[in-house]
Amino acid sequence: MTAIAPVITIDGPSGAGKGTLCKAMAEALQWHLLDSGAIYRVLALAALHHHVDLASEDALVPLASHLDVRFVSTDGNLEVILEGEDVSGEIRTQEVANAASQVAAFPRVREALLRRQRAFRKAPGLIADGRDMGTVVFPDAPVKIFLDASSEERAHRRMLQLQENGFSVNFERLLAEIKERDDRDRNRAVAPLVPAADALVLDSTRLSIEQVIEKALQYARQKLALA
């Protein structure tokens, strides 16, 4: 009988540092990486490209069922490929982020993408980045981490990220959007953003990314008994 590949789930709100942590852990452990948020962003982008109504669950489900998405890790960077095109930059805009939160609220859309996400589970292991990885997608994962940070700190990080990419941003507006998104994600009927009962809750507000990575890797290795 073939053993099921282990999974480390990293859940948490937007801007908490999940992406950076997951890439660092995947590199340290030499495991596969799933950015589930990117899948929802890719779906949102595909909907925008194909002029699909973001408010129509019936229209979004077929698109989700046939979504052509894959991840390619190159020199520590994660390329997100949609229909053969690198959309890594395009999916990181605030417009797509807000649209992704909208489409993720639909139960049948989430169900359509669930099987695709679980297919990323392969040996030697998987680092799964998302919002419901430990509660819904991989409830049997041996290691679960919920990475959090204050909304103000997350807005500040997002502002710096956007400015580095040449975007002009208003902090107060960005903070309001993050709070609105948090409220939507935490209170949706299906797969709300909550820590799994057996997850380590790690607050990164006053921690450097190096400290976050060190704490997460130490916890994961203890749980998995990895040297």
Swiss-Prot record:
One Pfam short name: Cytidylate_kin
GO biological process, one term: nucleobase-containing small molecule interconversion
EC number: 2.7.4.25
Localization annotation: Cytoplasm
Keywords: ATP-binding, Cytoplasm, Kinase, Nucleotide-binding, Transferase
Gene3D superfamilies hit by this protein: P-loop containing nucleotide triphosphate hydrolases
Gene Ontology, cellular component aspect: cytosol
Catalytic activity, reaction form: CMP + ATP = CDP + ADP; dCMP + ATP = dCDP + ADP
EC primary class: transferase
Cited InterPro entries: Cytidylate_kin, Cytidylate_kinase_dom, P-loop_NTPase
GO function term, MF aspect, one: dCMP kinase activity
Residues annotated to bind ATP: 12-20
Top-rank taxon: Bacteria
UniProt record similarity statement: Belongs to the cytidylate kinase family. Type 1 subfamily.
Classification via HAMAP family: Cytidyl_kinase_type1 (MF_00238)
Protein name per UniProt: Cytidylate kinase
